[in-house]
Amino acid sequence: MNISIITVGKLKEKYLKQGIAEYTKRLSAYAKVQEIEVSDEKAPEHLSEADMLLVKQKEGERILAKISPDTHVIALAIKGKQRTSEEFARELDQLATYGKSKIAFVIGGSLGLSDDVMKRADDTISFSKMTFPHQLMKLVLCEQIYRAYRINRNEPYHK
């Protein structure tokens, strides 16, 4: 399976880079993982609603440019569907079973994802109703993908 993790903005924190590198290394035994970073829009702190939409639209265009038509897209969003690790593992397994060999997980910037990206998404997922930095969510996502592969192969892993 080919998994792309598309994020807005460049990851700067060393500790997050190290964690993500560790999980992508572990995942290499199960899938080909590609990290794609698209540039974020520079924006002042206090934006109008119209400016926020414009920022999300520009970032969304960059995201969509990285997704091929045959890719199954899963957007990370607060209002996405919450799952247990076991449910997430089952869904990844079903995607592989039904021939979905390309999956892209999309993590938006600080303002979230554009409507166009959400419309392109085949599915949404939420890890919590809480708000987290999008850079941290990339690490959490990598860990959960790795956990899903371990679950699907009945291999031991932390509970």
UniProtKB/Swiss-Prot annotation:
Q: Which organism is it from?
A: Exiguobacterium sp. (strain ATCC BAA-1283 / AT1b)
What residues does S-adenosyl-L-methionine bind to? Answer: 76, 108, 127-132
Q: What is its main location?
A: cytoplasm
This chain belongs to which protein, by name?
Ribosomal RNA large subunit methyltransferase H
UniProt cross-references to Pfam families, sorted A to Z? SPOUT_MTase (PF02590)
Name the enzyme group at the top EC level. Answer: transferase
Localization annotation: Cytoplasm
Which EC number(s) does UniProt give?
Answer: 2.1.1.177
Q: By its UniProt entry, which Gene3D superfamilies does this protein fall under?
A: 3.40.1280.10
